[in-house]
Amino acid sequence: MISVCIATYNGEKYIGEQLASILKQLEANDEVIISDDGSTDATLSIINGFQDVRIKVVSGPQKHSPTLNFENVLHHAQGDYIFLSDQDDVWKTNKVATCMKWLQKYDCVICNAEVTDEHLNILFPSLFKLLHVSKNKIYNALWKNGYTGCCMAFTRCVKDAALPFPKDIPMYDIWIGNVAAFTYSVKFIDDRLISFRRHPATNSCNGKGSKFSKWQQIRFRWNIIKNILKNKIGKNSFLWKRK
């Protein structure tokens, strides 16, 4: 069973297109869990208009925090495989099938994406190249985050290990990515499986660099490492890897 987890807030402009691109790739027993953080536009009306029993909407934390909203939606996910999704992208038709193939060998898969404008015109053909993504887990932990949430799919064991989120992390994807990298197995794949839409209301990364100071980034990364080292994600799990 697959759980697609979406955190929404005032996403009426693009949520319909995104849901349509996702639902046609899922089986009847899969689910789309949506945590809505108090949208005041037509987001919920559009979602309800699909009348699809695979869609389940839960109330978000009402704090307008993507990290808290994603934590909430993950708590409700029942699937053996978890796919994270932003509310404004579009999935390529082979995203689920491609990721599922790799998830038979690895616990977490991070796919590439093409970066587009709001009309899906390609701005950058490769998100990995735009963000200078490294596949080295030490580099990702200590220097620059290589994990983009909407590109991530992982097994239930990664979800269970990552929850609950520590309170002192900058963003949900850097935490989940490092949990997966240091306790399970991660695979970066070059397949561009998402149209990663950039527009004025975008919350996620845009390739322009971090909004945090270097000192803040160092503190955030220390918090990530500290939470892993103190075994927050399970007894002896830092020393254990699935063979």
Residue locations for each model-derived region?
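Glycine-rich, basic loop-to-helix element that forms the pyrophosphate-binding segment
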Residues: 60-77
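Conserved nucleotide-sugar donor-binding catalytic segment
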Residues: 75, 135-209
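Conserved donor NDP-sugar-binding/catalytic core segment of glycosyltransferases
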Residues: 96-123
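Short beta-strand/loop segment that forms part of the nucleotide-sugar
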Residues: 29-38, 58-60
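Acidic helix N-cap motif at the loop->helix transition within catalytic regions
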Residues: 14-16, 39-49, 94
